[in-house]
């Protein structure tokens, strides 16, 4: 029997959340029948887009190339999200599946825009200004959703975005529609709770319980869609996450330090016209770019001297960060003190008490909580429990189930879970 596989990423789901979710019917059903990894260690940085690239490729960021949620744009503190798949530098699971002639689908998975090897594609569109049906249709078609797929699976559920402002409900509904109608061989789904609620309320607030209830409803709907597809006997389902979060109390703006030390050139309106060093936030860490390598010792000394004033516990050199699997063309990485998140602004104080955000991530994966992995279906040994694994272990394991190859993967196959 050929295996089919659905991988659901519930963003920032903690292992500890299972105590609450185990009281819910669908999670109780899953927990009583699944193979499980109790605690999965994430990658550095513990940030959504790099994490999902690692989940899709089995590689660390220094190899797959996605090191942030947003593009590096010096002088611009706004977010330019990495929508498109061309950010990847290695083969992912969807590529591998198409090489074997399998059908593929993805809904809400970061950086899948215009992916050439996803048959049923609904990209994650973050920070869009769209508010109407037509504006959302434009954005989704722009990122690779075929018009006929929009009409069949997106349009019937777009009210979740236009009226309820719920990307979560839209993604879950569209994915279930795809499973019911087309029963693809490989499906990836990303839903943004409980991450969104933890950002707003902190990691342990009772206000995140409605987000966990949404996760229960999502699982209920997916299980029903699998039954409705007519392929219940061949489908495997994985429910997991990408990272966890920590509570934050302060915001750090290293670019303010650079501006005060003439490493940024500003015009009379305070806009950046040139830069020698630029800090790009990765949440509770930040990558520091140095335009001219001869300035690197000056920038390093300045940052080292001001680590406490920036809410940092340490600074990684390029070589040290690469040893953590986190490397691109930046020179340094600033790591949080465990209470501070970073922003790109240069016109604010270097360190201020937190305002809006109460929880965040992007920190080194040795910090904070871990997330679970629950797997059910004919490919998995019911009742098997592994105490831990690594985020990069998922993709090579899913590749083995699907009968495809990921030769670049850094992770290892979780043989103990498989039949």
Question: Could you tell me what each predicted segment is?
Answer:
Residues 6-7, 26, 214-258, 398:
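Metal-dependent active-site segment of extracytoplasmic phospho-/sulfohydrolases and closely related
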Residues 11-12, 241-244, 338:
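Active-site metal-binding loops of divalent metal-dependent hydrolases
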Residues 15-17, 112-119, 195-199, 246-249, ...:
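Short catalytic/ligand-binding loop motif for oxyanion handling, primarily in non-cytosolic enzymes
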Residues 18-54, 58-62, 105:
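Short, structured active-site-proximal loop/turn typified by the sulfatase FGly-forming signature C/S-X-P-X-R
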Residues 39, 103-108, 186-190, 239-240, ...:
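A structural signal for short, well-ordered beta-strand segments and their strand-loop junctions
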Residues 60-202, 284, 299, 308:
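His/Asp/Glu-rich, glycine-adjacent segments
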Residues 229, 234, 241-291:
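Acidic/histidine-rich catalytic neighborhood
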Residues 273-397:
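Active-site neighborhoods of enzymes that stabilize oxyanions during catalysis
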């Amino acid at each position: 029997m050929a295996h089919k596989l659905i991988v659901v990423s519930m963003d920032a789901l903690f292992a500890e959340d299972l105590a609450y979710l185990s009281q819910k019917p669908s999670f109780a059903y899953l927990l009583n029948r699944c193979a499980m990894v109790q605690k999965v260690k994430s990658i550095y940085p513990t940030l959504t887009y790099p994490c999902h690239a690692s989940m899709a490729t089995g590689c660390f960021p220094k190899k797959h190339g996605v090191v942030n949620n947003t593009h590096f744009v010096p002088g611009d503190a706004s977010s330019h999200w990495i929508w498109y798949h061309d950010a990847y530098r290695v083969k992912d699971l969807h590529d591998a599946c198409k090489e074997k002639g399998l059908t593929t689908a993805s809904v809400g998975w970061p950086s899948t825009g215009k992916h050439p090897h996803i048959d049923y594609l609904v990209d994650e569109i973050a920070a869009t200004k769209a508010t109407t049906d037509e504006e959302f249709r434009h954005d989704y078609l722009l990122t690779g959703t075929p018009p006929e797929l929009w009409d069949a699976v997106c349009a019937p559920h777009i009210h979740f975005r236009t009226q309820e402002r719920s990307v979560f409900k839209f993604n879950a509904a569209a994915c279930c529609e795809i499973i019911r109608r087309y029963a693809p061989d490989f499906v990836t789904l990303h839903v943004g709770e409980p991450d969104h609620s933890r950002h707003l309320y902190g990691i342990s607030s009772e206000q995140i319980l409605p987000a966990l209830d949404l996760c229960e409803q999502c699982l209920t709907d997916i299980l029903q869609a699998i039954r409705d597809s007519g392929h219940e006997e061949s489908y495997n389902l994985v429910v997991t996450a990408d990272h966890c979060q920590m509570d934050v109390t302060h915001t750090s703006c290293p670019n303010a330090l650079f501006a005060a030390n003439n490493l940024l050139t500003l015009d009379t309106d305070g806009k950046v016209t040139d830069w020698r060093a630029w800090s790009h936030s990765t949440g509770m860490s930040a990558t520091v770019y140095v335009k001219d390598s001869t300035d690197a010792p000056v920038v390093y000394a300045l940052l080292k001297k001001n680590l406490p004033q920036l809410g940092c516990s340490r600074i990684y050199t390029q070589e040290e960060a690469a040893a953590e699997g986190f490397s691109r063309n930046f020179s340094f990485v600033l790591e949080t003190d465990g209470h501070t998140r970073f922003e790109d602004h240069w016109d604010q104080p270097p360190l201020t008490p937190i305002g809006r955000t109460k929880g965040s991530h992007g920190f080194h994966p040795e910090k904070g909580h871990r997330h679970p992995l629950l797997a059910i279906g004919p490919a998995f040994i019911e009742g098997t429990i592994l105490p831990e694994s690594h985020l990069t272990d998922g993709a090579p394991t899913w590749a083995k189930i699907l009968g495809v190859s990921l030769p670049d993967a850094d992770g290892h196959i979780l043989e103990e879970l498989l039949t």
